[in-house]
Curated annotation (Swiss-Prot):
GO terms for biological process: translation. GO terms for cellular component: cytosolic large ribosomal subunit. This is Large ribosomal subunit protein bL28. The keyword Ribonucleoprotein applies. The keyword Ribosomal protein applies. Coiled coil: none annotated. It comes from Acidovorax ebreus (strain TPSY). InterPro entries: Ribosomal_bL28, Ribosomal_bL28/bL31-like_sf, Ribosomal_bL28_bact-type, Ribosomal_bL28_sf. The gene is rpmB.
């Protein structure tokens, strides 16, 4: 699926553009996705993930091994 974070599952949301005159038109809020390579020391290889900026902070906090273990438990990696 396009534009989905592989770690957090964040997807585009739907909302409104609101003008100064309070006119509303539909728009999409896209997650801030980046392709990023992570070195996995336990597997001695690089892993390439499409992650949101929130997922990058999660990986910094918990470590890539912990995040990959959670993804594998969900059946995503």
């Amino acid at each position: 699926m396009a534009r989905v974070c592989e770690v957090t599952g964040k997807k585009p949301m739907v909302g409104n553009n609101v003008s100064h005159a309070n006119n509303k038109t539909k728009r999409r809020f896209l997650p801030n996705l980046q392709y990023r390579r992570f070195w996995v020391e336990s597997e001695n290889r690089w892993v390439r993930l499409r992650v949101s900026s929130a997922a990058l902070r999660l990986i910094d906090k918990n470590g890539i091994d912990s995040v990959l273990a959670d993804m594998r438990a969900r059946g995503q990696a």
